[in-house]
Amino acid sequence: MKNIYFDNAATTKLDEEVLKEMMPYLKENYGNASSVYSLGRESRKAVEESREKIAKLLNCKPTEIYFTAGGSESDNTAIKGIAHSYREKGNHIITSKIEHPAVLETCKELEKEEFEVSYISVDKNGTIDLEELKSEIRPTTILISVMFANNEIGTIEPIKEIGKIAKENEIYFHTDAVQAVGNIKIDVQELNIDILSLSGHKFYGPKGIGALYVKSGVHFKKYIDGGHQERNKRAGTENVPAIVGMGKALELAYHSMEEHNSKIKELRDYYEKRVKEEIDNIKINGNIENRLPGNSNISFKNADGEGILLNLDMQGICASSGSACTSGSLNPSHVLLAIGVEQELAKNSLRISMGKYNTKEEVDYLVDNLKQIIDRMRKV
């Protein structure tokens, strides 16, 4: 049975053009990028060209881009790195209640080190409360960390406004942009972003590679000791094929963003239209207007979310009930609870995240099966 993939917020299929770009560095140009001989110099050149591509697309300097193993490492490095570097200035961090576990768990670890963390509320759409954010700022606040777009409900946060608040109060601003990069054109200068996390596999690039943008002049502590790679900020031999792949993937994403987003949004809206018309007792979660183009999070009354997923899987349909990083948890989504969804209804959610390879025929197949599954579950 062919799989029909609707979980692009969890990961995306590697683009064939990206794979083609990576192949020479897996087969012929396999030299260590830190080596001085020609094979190593070829690898170094490829790494720096990819760094330049990413920097140009984010409107920053190549020296402000640091390669990591992915979004979680980038988030950990950003938050712990700033906290430990500026502890003498203060010990207070502000974040939101709907962040990815890579941010929330990092903040919880810092609380064990006597850092203080304020968790800002969001409204029913998942949008951060800017007035509460302002009211939580203290003389000891050193960092604000708010995600660019939510991985479960797709809500896009008012990043420019948050960046302005942070700048006016001389506080560093980090955004987990893992879901946004590749879907939204981001200018770190215009948005007053000091630190930004991204991950290659969210925009049709390879897994196991990410990056951290850190504005010049912002200091952060390193957490992997050893060699002097990444300007002595992250030890370890560079993953050259993955770095090359991520640079190519982001370049492709930017060049075709409007076209793909328009198509993906059209499919998402068609899916929701059919669901609203053909299945009763549903609730669409998140900001209907201001969200990622492929995201749809719907709760189905009297139909267990895990049961829906298992039944969809039996029909070859891949979907999710929320963050892939919390799968296996019996607890309802912290994001849905934060936006006021009742606990039972939060357990009955289905996240569909569409991508550039999805088709209208696949959406029809999804809804046709979903109708039958919900009907069966409600009759039990």
Segments the model singles out, each with a brief description of its role:
Residues 1-380:
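Pyridoxal 5′-phosphate
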